[in-house]
Amino acid sequence: MSDKGIFRTSSTPSIVDVTPDRGERPRKLVRSVLESPSQKDVASIVKIEQTPSRPFFNDFLKKRITDSLNERPNLLNKFMSAQDGTPSKSTGFNERSSQLVSEFTTTEDIENCEETTQVLPPRLVVYELRLTNFKSYAGTQIVGPFHPSFSSIVGPNGSGKSNVIDALLFVFGFRASKLRQSKASALIHKSATHPSLDSCDVEITFKEVNSDFTYVDGSELTVRRTAYKNNTSKYFVNGVESSFSAVSNLLKEKGIDLNHKRFLILQGEVESIAQMKPRAISEGDDGLLEYLEDIIGTSKYKPIIEENMQELSNSDDICAEKESRLKLVLSEKAKLEDSKNSVLSFLKDENELFMKQNQLYRTILYETRNKKTLVQNLLNSLEGKLQAHLEKFEQTERDISEKNEEVKSLREKAAKVKNDCTSEKKTRQSYEQQTVKIEEQLKFLLNKEKKLKKSIEALSFEKSEAENSLSSHDIDSQKLNSEIADLSLRLQQEELSLDDIRKSLQGKTEGISNAIEEKQKAMAPALEKINQLTSEKQILQVELDMLLNKENDLINDVESSQSSLDKLRNDAEENRNILSSKLKVLSDLKGEKKDVSKNIERKKETVHNTYRNLMSNRTKLEEMKASLSSSRSRGNVLESLQRLHESDNLNGFFGRLGDLATIDEAYDVAISTACPALNHIVVDNIETGQKCVAFLRSNNLGRASFIILKELAQKNLARIQTPENVPRLFDLLRFNDQKFAPAFYNVLQNTLVAKNLEQANRIAYGKTRWRVVTLSGQLIDKSGTMTGGGTRVKKGGMSSAITSDVSPASVETCDKQVQLEDTRYRQHLSELESLNQRFTEISERIPSAELEISKLQLDVSACDRLVAGEERRILQLKSDLKSIRNNNERKRNLQNKISNMDKEVEAININNEGLVTEIKTLQDKIMEIGGIRYRIQKSKVDDLHEQLKFVKDKLNKMSFKKKKNEQRSQSFQVELSNLTSEYDTTTESIATLKTELQSLNKYVDEHKSRLREFENALWDINSSIDELVKFIEFESKQMNSVKAERIELENQIQEQRTALSEVGNNENKYLKLMSNLKLHNLTEFCDQTTMDSTFPEYSEDELSSVDKSELVSNISVLKKKTEDREVDINVLSEYRRCNKEAEKRDSDYQSELQKRTDLKKVVTDLQSQRLDEFMYGFGIISMKLKEMYQIITMGGNAELELVDSLDPFSEGVLFSVMPPKKSWKNISNLSGGEKTLSSLALVFALHNYKPTPLYVMDEIDAALDFKNVSIVANYIKERTKNAQFIVISLRSNMFELSSRLVGIYKTANMTKSVTINNKEILTD
């Protein structure tokens, strides 16, 4: 910022210094008088006519302020006792405030505070303003950059200085009314130049600055607000749209609080700071107390304290209410004591009865469980044997399953390998087809190469001939030219000799010679014409010869090409016929393959179904054999007893239980599963049963279970209400005789029938437990256990349908059926194998056929290309021939022209025949006159003329021939070049195809090798599958034999389970009776040491020695004692309720008391913390205020005092001032300047306590005199390095001390600005 001599306007934002170097010239100041309280202090500067510079006065003030600060020995003592000589104010801090200040404020605290402020971290400052169409600023105007410490805004009245402050206020969220406008749209600039603008905006650029006034890199922050014509506005932060709350929070984090706006002191507002009331009169107002609390930070406690006070008040009300409710419930409890005692006596008697019943039930249970143990041991033995069979059966099943999985895995592997084979075949076929295609292409290219080679050789020979001819022409031409030169020389010599002879005969022949010359002159045009015609004729004759030769060549080419085309067409037709037959064969093969594939799928399904039927029938056969064996065993017992009954030796025998009733076939599985006792034998009494047992034992016929009708308890057999109205299994039976109903009910009880397992679960596990069986044989017991289901279900239990069906004849029939199915299975398997072989054979033939077809297609395609090529060649030749023949007009014209030339020459000769004759006659005369010598010489000359003409004609013909050969050579060269290029391309293509063919052959060989590997692997897998299938068939037969043994054991186990079930039912009965016994819990009303709350446990010895008859007698006595008494049991519950209610209400009351105590502590702590923090800050601010006021006024005094010393927050804070050499006065009684100084002293004191990085002041020095302006300006410059001051001032004492001046001026009703660095100038 040291650019010199550069003037900056608002359009050039760089900062410049328009002053020369400080040592260049002195600076004159106007005459001024500095008034002060002591003339002695400023005697050296009074009435200075010619001062060296303003800095002298500034230095004086700086020294005065520094001395004042250094002279104070102790701020706290000075504050308390006014040791500076000024009278102490009796209405100042009273005893309480003095105590608080001394308690919370010490000199060390203040010094520490000062020391802390010396460590200046980076702070946020306003760098510059960018105003666009804002109020008086038209267009975009940049105001600034501002100095990080002290900047002054100067300019004439009305130029727009305050609009700078308005711009800041606008961005800081002030309404238009605060900016001296009625609405936001009024802020948009309007002038003659810019009468109608749509918007205006102000952008503030902030930067962070270090203590040495260097800016922090990357710290730039821009905040912009834009107002529109429709009175709306938007905020932007760093160019991104934002909101006022976001802007406010962002700046608050940087230290600029937009809510309290302490940093803004607007025009006319400086005096109002010190004139604030001690505290706010109403909510929303601000008093001095609130002003200080916001700065100190204790205002945050106010809403919290108020909220807690409200809660404390509410808690007092709740405590009173809860105490009243507690007393009410205690009174109600006392009224129930007598009724409670009566009920307790009755319940104790009932508990004694339940004790006796519990002991009786436990004794019976002990006996039942001993019996259950014996049955269980036998059952465990049978189940152990069954388990061994099951393990063997399951092991076999696992082996079969594992082998099946192996077969499945191998078949999947075989399928994968088969797919790989197919894929390899297709890949190999694809490569073979590509090979054939390339071989055909190679064959075609080799033929083409051969033809091209012949054509190149022929053309090369013709070109060589033409070039040789041209070469010999040059030699011959040279010879002829040499000969012409010799002849011309000789002719010249001979003519000279002839002229000499003529000259010698001139006298004799002059007349004749003249006549000859005249006639020769007359004949010269004709001779010239003849020579011209002869030359033209020779040219036309050459052209005519060329046309005739080309036509003959084309005719020969057409005939040759037509012959080749006919041969190619015959070859193509032959290949097409072969291809057609091959395609038909391929189509037939594919059709047959498709049919065979379908037949294979059908046959596979047939084989699968046949195998499934075979295995099913085998299983059925084994089950029938096992069932027949079991039926025979069971039938022997029943049949023997039946014969005994028929012989009248066994009265009361009724037969098998399942034969004494019938049921619908739909419920066959359900009854067979739910009632294992259907095979039990029914007798009338124990005696009959004992006879049956003795008979079976004596005859060694086996065992049987019996149901004794007379021993069955009488039950209510009427229909019952069931869940979801499902039927009860007992109700579905049709009895042979109603007397058998109790027997069936005894084994079935209330077993229900559900349609499916889902319905069974709903019913069985409902509120009431039920025994439920499904139609498919799944049984859910009351205990929750589930049995039955699976692949093999029980059926035929109600009748002997299955037993009667399983006869030896039916077993034999089933065996024959199994053998028949086995034969069919093997036959279908053989047919499937044949189909697979045929499918494989067809699959192998198809690729070969496709390969042959591919070759034929390539041959046909090649022939078609050759035919098309020959046809195009013939068409082109015929087109050329036609073009030549169409050019006959030219040929006729040439012939006519040559003929006309001949005629014209002949006519000329005829016309000049007389002259020729005359000339010859005259020449003959000269010959006669000249004699022999002349004739000889004349003959020589004529002979030389003839020779020269002959040689020249020969030379001309050679020139024509040379031209023709040159044309032919060029034509041959072009054609040879094309043929050579085509030959090279063909050769390259052949090499490429050979490489491709070699690579493809390699691929084909590789895929053939892989195909062989896959085929070998497939054969190995199929062999393994065959071995596994044989193993599975053998194991399946073994498993069927194990099934028969298992069925016999299951029947024995079922009998023992039935017996165990009966014992279990009896056990459950007494367990249920025991579970219904519940002792009344009286421990909460009686002494726990004398009152049992649970039943006692008994040892086996105690149970075995119990006298059941005595117990029954005692139980009877207790029942009579309790049956006749009537008591209201509900009294206990009511007493219990009252007691619990009393405890609950007492607990609530104590809890609320504790809550109230806690709230009181919270409120006390908050109030104490608020007071402590406020008084600490208040003491520091008071000290600083006193110090600031003394510095600013040079001897005055100011105090902040509490209106109520006991409670600073009740009446607020007073601001009292004692101007220099005056008494203590209230702020309202001060002059304008004194009010301003007081406010500024408070502002500076608050800044010292809690610095704000930015202050914006608008003409705060308006009411101050020259001296006070200088004091304030010096203080701002020297003592506020940690803040940025932007001051609008018209007082030179103020703005001359600023570090930077921002000048505001207006032209054409549009404000502009200029910024300069304000540097001091030293005088000589």
Curated annotation (Swiss-Prot):
Q: Where is this region: Disordered?
A: 1-24
Q: Which protein is depicted? A: Structural maintenance of chromosomes protein 4
Task: Identify the keywords attached in UniProt to this record, alphabetized.
Answer: ATP-binding, Cell cycle, Cell division, Chromosome, Coiled coil, Cytoplasm, DNA condensation, Mitosis, Nucleotide-binding, Nucleus, Phosphoprotein
Annotated GO MF terms: ATP binding; ATP hydrolysis activity; DNA translocase activity
Task: Quote the record's binding site residues for ATP.
Answer: 155-162
Which cysteines share a disulfide bond? none
Any one of the GO BP annotations = mitotic chromosome condensation
| Primary role | Central component of the condensin complex, a complex required for conversion of interphase chromatin into mitotic-like condense chromosomes. The condensin complex probably introduces positive supercoils into relaxed DNA in the presence of type I topoisomerases and converts nicked DNA into positive knotted forms in the presence of type II topoisomerases.
Keyword Cytoplasm tagged: yes
Compartments where found: Nucleus; Cytoplasm; Chromosome
Self-association state and partner proteins as the record states: Forms a heterodimer with cut14/smc2. Component of the condensin complex, which contains the smc2 and smc4 heterodimer, and three non smc subunits that probably regulate the complex: cnd1, cnd2 and cnd3. Interacts with C1739.07.
**Family statement:** Belongs to the SMC family. SMC4 subfamily.
SMC hinge domain segment(s): 651-764
Q: Domain comment, in the record's words? A: The flexible SMC hinge domain, which separates the large intramolecular coiled coil regions, allows the heterodimerization with cut14, forming a V-shaped heterodimer.
Coiled-coil residues are 310-337, 370-628, 825-1077, 1297-1324
Any Pfam family: SMC_hinge
* One Gene Ontology CC term in the entry: chromatin
UniProt modified residues of type Phosphothreonine = 19
Tell me how the protein is altered or processed after translation. Answer: Phosphorylated by CDC2 on Thr-19 at metaphase.
